[in-house]
Amino acid sequence: MLYILTGEIQTGKTRWLQGLIDKLQEKGVPLEGVLAPGVWKSNPTKPNGFEKLGIDNVMLPGGEVVPFARRRDLAPDDASKMELQGMPADMKLAWAFSDEAVERVNAHFVALAAGEAPARPGLLVVDELGRLELERGGLGLTKAVDLVAQGPRPGWPHALIVV
């Protein structure tokens, strides 16, 4: 079964998903895929007291952290170094994405697809699919899209994607 977690920007989708992942891990459920927590700093002028600076990707199950995207307006020089190849100019995204990070995360999904299924059925997690993957195709986490499109597998009868 495919579960889709959706909601407005910065409403806590990934925080909720992290809580679910923690509970499933406590129960021994195999989890594979990627979680995309925000990179935050304290900012008392913001309604929630924090300001989002970027997005990391945490590979499941290993926990490797990959710096994935950073806000363009905060560090234009750093952001320009993270420009995703093939990004259409008209997309005007607030985030600069790292080619290396996208390649690393896509390679992770390729390895999951080619690897052996866990001994116990688990959950495939994709946090998150957005405009790059859904509006333009061929950009972003394309290998995650391919894997989810294959449908249930013995190792992951269920998948949860964040959109």
Located regions from the model:
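Phosphate-binding/switch loop-helix module in NTP-utilizing enzymes
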Residues: 75-136, 142
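Hydrophobic anchor at the beta1->P-loop junction of P-loop NTPases
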Residues: 5
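Hydrophobic positions on the alpha1 helix immediately C-terminal to the Walker A/P-loop
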Residues: 16, 20
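Conserved lysine of the Walker
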Residues: 13
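Short, conserved "post-DEAD/DEAH" coupling segment immediately C-terminal to helicase motif II
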Residues: 137-151
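Loop/turn-to-beta-strand initiation segments
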Residues: 120-123, 151-162
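The conserved Walker
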Residues: 9
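N-terminal phosphate/diphosphate-binding loop that engages ATP/GTP or pyrophosphate donors
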Residues: 21-88
